[in-house]
Amino acid sequence: MNDVSKASLPKAIFLMGPTASGKTALAIELRKVLPVELISVDSALIYRGMDIGTAKPSADELKAAPHRLLNIRDPSQAYSAADFRRDALAQMAEITAAGRIPLLVGGTMLYFKALLEGLSPLPSADPEVRSRIEQQAAELGWELLHQQLQEIDPVAAARIHPNDPQRLSRALEVFFISGKTLTELTQTSGDALPYQVHQFAIAPASRELLHQRIELRFHQMLASGFEAEVRALFARGDLHTDLPSIRCVGYRQMWSYIEGEISYDEMVYRGVCATRQLAKRQMTWLRGWEGVRWLDSENPDRARKEVLQVVGAIAD
């Protein structure tokens, strides 16, 4: 698409960044001065009843700056990148039709990628094939199935841990159904996003600062009642650690503590470590991201001004 035809497309803003970088605070400030509506791009914030451990915006913040695609699933339900793309496109169309600009804010980079580039033509899940894989796993163990994936698709096997049955099963299922590897298929993109997108990433200037922010926020969550929140989920009886919701960072570690598998101190240590690892993965995505403008989260006023310099003209 050439620059002229791109300029005729409706506008959108992406505000990306690692966890604890100040994305939400900046988005709320931007909404005060720009004709934008916020759409959450976060695979944890979609869940109801998971507020403290996901650092969900407070009731006051949401009143001042409503976020779409928040609290749209029960923790027992799945939500895919395809689900997100469908829902986000519908919300973006609605916002644009009202004469405003969609501002998509979050840290789930897979969702941003799916929205921007479209989805690979992966086959739909097949219960029969999935059942056969699970039966094999029960007989032989997931470790052996991971070795099988290494032979079929070494790139996917390097990315998927043997203790991640959901993703391991899906990679094998895709091959058994289509005859093509997950790596082959994910290199084929779908429909590109029909918007002129201005992309920003916010993060502290140093890794040490980000680590400090992560540790501080985890302790703030604990002080705000995170344990009670997870105990309420645990008490339901229908949730478990194979679900994406309970595998969210912080929740998985607190779950292990509640089950008596680890001590409280170990839970805190693992929770902070897991959050840092998540931030590292997010930063790896962002460093390879094309067309992104970087903002310093340690200087929020300057970050806001930089966005306004770029976006102010398109918002007039």
UniProtKB/Swiss-Prot annotation:
Residues the UniProt record annotates as site (Interaction with substrate tRNA): 108, 130
Keyword tRNA processing: yes
Pfam short name (any one): IPPT
Residues annotated to bind ATP: 17-24
Annotated region described as Interaction with substrate tRNA, given as residue ranges: 42-45, 166-170, 247-252
SUPFAM superfamilies assigned: P-loop containing nucleoside triphosphate hydrolases
Enzyme class: transferase
EC identifiers of the protein: 2.5.1.75
Annotated substrate binding sites: 19-24
Cofactor (UniProt): Mg(2+)
Catalytic activity: adenosine(37) in tRNA + dimethylallyl diphosphate = N(6)-dimethylallyladenosine(37) in tRNA + diphosphate
This protein's UniProt keywords: ATP-binding, Magnesium, Nucleotide-binding, Transferase, tRNA processing
GO molecular function: ATP binding; tRNA dimethylallyltransferase activity
InterPro entries associated with the record: Dimethylallyltransferase, IPT, P-loop_NTPase
Gene Ontology terms describing biological process: tRNA modification
Reported function: Catalyzes the transfer of a dimethylallyl group onto the adenine at position 37 in tRNAs that read codons beginning with uridine, leading to the formation of N6-(dimethylallyl)adenosine (i(6)A).
HAMAP family: IPP_trans
Similarity comment: family membership: Belongs to the IPP transferase family.
Subunit (UniProt): Monomer.
Name by which UniProt lists this protein: tRNA dimethylallyltransferase
